[in-house]
């Protein structure tokens, strides 16, 4: 059994008559909809909601500007010592005042530094996990009171994200001293203590984790830059769904400074949303959105032949872009790069590897 990416295209149309192009500040997948947060010169954010069954989209004006996060109950927006809580339809349901918590940090010589979209999340009981400066996890209750703090383990270089499963199990994802080394740690949110690290969840290359999507009770999908995995809690093992680049899927393309968005559909399958381009049509500014979903395939339907491109250095953007298009649409073949640029390049062994790679290509 394997999973093959399936692509759908959607357009968002904005009024460009005032000469202001809205920027994207968040993209999410949730239920049967895609959510794109846009911001124009009004300094008010707008959530654009695309119904994937009809392709139609609606808009909701939000209270102000903020940084947005997907949580266990819907979404949250953080700004000015306040966390605004939204449900799965992006309707406001409440606020959490974090001013006392932040004042407590400042009094002790600390500060709250939040770097990316996976650094705040919330469980169904209102407990909030916040990763600050990529090295400390703060747990705060629904009233903004500090519950516990957890430092990054000494043998790891950073905390990349915090997440909570549907059953209420909390984890942090830590990056190791070497690029691509990733360890998952369970967290006791009352005491702040960590359980034993899980080191063998990811395998393959380019496996920096970019997002986690909980499913069922304690299972979760893992998006790395090159693979999608599912962690199976019952057996404490993971399975690879597919290699994204083999199918031409680029993660975190930074199309409008927002990268990619992730989330779960109602059928418990993960999805990826990407901004792919734009064009102006009269007074309309049209933004192109691509949705990637995953379809189960069996037997020969899941098999394609690998073509290896031997390169002396990393491929250029144009070369990689062309290969990604090929991998996305070719039903029989896909291309991978094998780079041989190192101090041993001129050895006979390295020359032979290059020759074999070029021959296979």
Label the model's feature ranges:
Residues 30, 43, 71, 79-81, ...:
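Short loop/turn segments that connect beta-strands within the blades of beta-propeller domains
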Residues 35, 74-76, 127-129, 170-172, ...:
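Conserved beta-propeller blade signature
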Residues 315-334:
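Short, polar/charged alpha-helical segment
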Residues 2-19, 42-62, 82-109, 135-154, ...:
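Surface-exposed loop/turn elements that mediate protein-protein interactions on large endomembrane-trafficking
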Residues 344-361:
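Pocket-flanking alpha-helical
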């Amino acid at each position: 059994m394997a999973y093959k990416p399936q692509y759908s295209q959607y357009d968002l149309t904005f009024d460009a008559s005032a000469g202001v192009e809205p920027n994207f500040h968040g993209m999410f997948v949730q239920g049967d909809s895609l959510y794109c947060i846009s911001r124009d010169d009004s300094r008010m954010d707008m959530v654009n909601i695309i119904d994937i069954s009809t392709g139609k989209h609606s808009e909701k004006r939000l209270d102000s500007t903020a940084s947005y996060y997907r949580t266990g109950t819907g979404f949250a927006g953080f700004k000015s010592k306040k966390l605004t809580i939204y449900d799965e339809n992006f309707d406001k349901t409440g606020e959490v005042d974090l001013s006392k918590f932040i004042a407590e940090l400042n009094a002790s010589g600390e500060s709250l530094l939040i770097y990316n979209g996976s650094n705040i999340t919330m469980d169904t009981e209102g407990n909030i996990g916040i990763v600050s400066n990529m090295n400390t996890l703060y747990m705060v209750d629904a009233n903004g009171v500090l519950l516990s703090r957890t430092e990054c383990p000494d043998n790891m270089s950073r905390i990349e994200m915090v997440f909570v499963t549907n059953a209420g199990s909390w984890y942090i994802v830590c990056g190791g001293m070497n690029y691509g080394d990733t360890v998952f740690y369970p967290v006791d949110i009352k005491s702040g203590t960590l359980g034993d690290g899980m080191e063998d969840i990811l395998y393959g290359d380019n496996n920096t984790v970019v997002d986690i999507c909980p499913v069922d009770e304690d299972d979760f999908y893992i998006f790395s830059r090159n693979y999608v995995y599912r962690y199976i809690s019952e057996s404490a093992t993971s399975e690879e769904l597919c290699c994204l680049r083999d199918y031409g899927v680029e993660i975190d393309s930074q199309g409008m400074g927002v990268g990619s968005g992730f989330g779960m559909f109602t059928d418990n399958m993960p999805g990826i949303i990407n901004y792919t381009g734009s064009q102006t049509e009269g007074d309309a500014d049209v933004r192109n959105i691509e949705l990637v979903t995953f379809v189960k395939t069996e037997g020969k339907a899941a098999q394609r032949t690998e073509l290896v491109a031997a390169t002396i250095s990393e491929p250029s953007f144009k070369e990689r872009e062309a290969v990604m298009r090929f991998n996305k649409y070719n039903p029989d073949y896909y291309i991978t790069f094998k780079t041989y640029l190192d101090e041993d390049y001129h050895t006979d062994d390295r020359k032979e590897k290059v020759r074999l790679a070029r021959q296979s290509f």
